[in-house]
Structure formats: structure tokens, C-alpha cells
């Protein structure tokens, strides 16, 4: 039995401890925000927060989340921080096709939680584990800067 907190709710699962968290989130909880991209922890499409820090759920076995807290984009989307980031992404054109957006939003939350006023370079480093083929990153960096300014006091 593996116990953990998922998007604020206590969860108990009797599954193989080597099961990938990504598969469990999508197949058992119907949480489709985390996506299968590369399956190797390189693209960030599967990003979630583990005790407030970004991790790639495609590489994370259930055994590693026992007694921990997982937040997916679905859980994060219910917060004021998410609203500030989503508004900034829309305003700055930081989201186009949407494939990377959930993971990018999780990366931005993790970054801003640790550093509420990051420089452009710190943002680029903070999102470096997330690939985006549409925006060229400049609009995403600008969106995170905008969210940090407009959401002053949220992080």
C-alpha cells in the first residue's frame, strides 16, 4: 500500500511500487495534464511538483512518492498563483500549441516558489528541463517575468 497526497487529497494505492507515476496519474486518476513526451525525463511534458519541487513523473516510480505530496497542473490550476501565470502566458503569447504548457507552468511555479523575482537567466535555467518547439522561449521567459511582477506577494 502506497500512501501519498495528490492535489490536496490523501490517496492510498495498492499497485506495483515500480509503476511510473505518470501512468498512474493518467490511467487511475484521469489526470491528463502531465503528458508522455520522451519517456526519459528530458522534455518536461510530464512535470509535476513533488513536495513543491519539479520532477518528471515519467521517471518516478510510485515507491519514491510514499508519504509525499504530488501536485499536478490540475491541482495547481485551482490557485491564485496559477491564475497569475496563466494570465501572463496569455498576455505574452507564452503558450501556443499547448503540449509543453502544463509542464512549463509547473516549472514556472517551482522556480517562482524558490525565487519570486528571478532574472531572465534564472528563468531560462529554471525552465531548461522543459522543451518547447513553438515559442523559442522568449515569450515564456517574458510571461514568467510578467507573472512575477503582477503576482507580487503570491510567491
Cite the ranges covered by each PLM segment.
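Signature of N-terminal electron-transfer/Fe-S-associated modules in redox systems
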Residues: 1-155
Amino acid at each position: 500500500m502506497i500512501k501519498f497526497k495528490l492535489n490536496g487529497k490523501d490517496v492510498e494505492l495498492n499497485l506495483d511500487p515500480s509503476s511510473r507515476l505518470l501512468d498512474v496519474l493518467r490511467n487511475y486518476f484521469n489526470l491528463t495534464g502531465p503528458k508522455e513526451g520522451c519517456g526519459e525525463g528530458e522534455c518536461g511534458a510530464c512535470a509535476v511538483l513533488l513536495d513543491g519541487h519539479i520532477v518528471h513523473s515519467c521517471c518516478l516510480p510510485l515507491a519514491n512518492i510514499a508519504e509525499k505530496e504530488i501536485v499536478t497542473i490540475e491541482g495547481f490550476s485551482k490557485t491564485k498563483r496559477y491564475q497569475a501565470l496563466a494570465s501572463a502566458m496569455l498576455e505574452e503569447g507564452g503558450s501556443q500549441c499547448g503540449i509543453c504548457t502544463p509542464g512549463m507552468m509547473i516549472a514556472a511555479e517551482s522556480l517562482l516558489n524558490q525565487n519570486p523575482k528571478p532574472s531572465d537567466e534564472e528563468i531560462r535555467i529554471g525552465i531548461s528541463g522543459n522543451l518547447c518547439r513553438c515559442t523559442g522561449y522568449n515569450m515564456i521567459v517574458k510571461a514568467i517575468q510578467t507573472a512575477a511582477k503582477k503576482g507580487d506577494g503570491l510567491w
